[in-house]
């Protein structure tokens, strides 16, 4: 049944994230958008993104954009750009701007919430005089060799990440064979975010203290897991002209 599939998908995603190494406190930023974001409830969705982003501001800097990115991915997966087959034949620039206005709002609101929260957090911590300590991750050395097989991580970050997420990548790749089912704007948004998170997570893995396992690839793992499960469970909403 549909209910059983949902529980199976949720259970599998939880186990996958545990295998990658997504820490429990970071999963708050995954659960809130998944539970509360919906194109039918814009205000509830915005509140969920802001609350999750506030938590991100107290957690990890490379997760600042994640609540908004998860919400945007859900939006691209569930919301067709056009409301009818007639509109699909001639999408105007105005329609595209209107469609992207919601994701843009989430992105801006989420980042501002996370950044402001970090400022407040630094101040309340009593270490505002040593604020540079909170941004040391931006200035630490990059150990690029950790991306590939090495003594610290025999498999290497990139090969291991591709191996673990391989079935998910295959699922998304197979879905692109039906590329007309989604407007190109939706595909560009989804694939662009996945590539950005893979590259960004790989860079974070080269920082001192990272690269010994896959825990710094967590942001990428979360999004590719969500996107792949949407396609696998048939929850992606096609454009009207492609619906059977």
Task: Report the location of each language-model feature.
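Signature aromatic-anchored transmembrane alpha helix within multi-pass, membrane-resident enzymes
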Residues: 5, 100-108, 236-244
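Alpha-helical transmembrane segments
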Residues: 169-174, 228-234
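Short linear functional motifs in flexible/disordered or boundary regions
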Residues: 67, 231, 238-239
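Hydrophobic transmembrane alpha-helices
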Residues: 31-40, 49-52, 70-82, 225-233
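Transmembrane catalytic cores of multi-pass membrane glycosyltransferases
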Residues: 1, 11-25, 44-47, 54-221
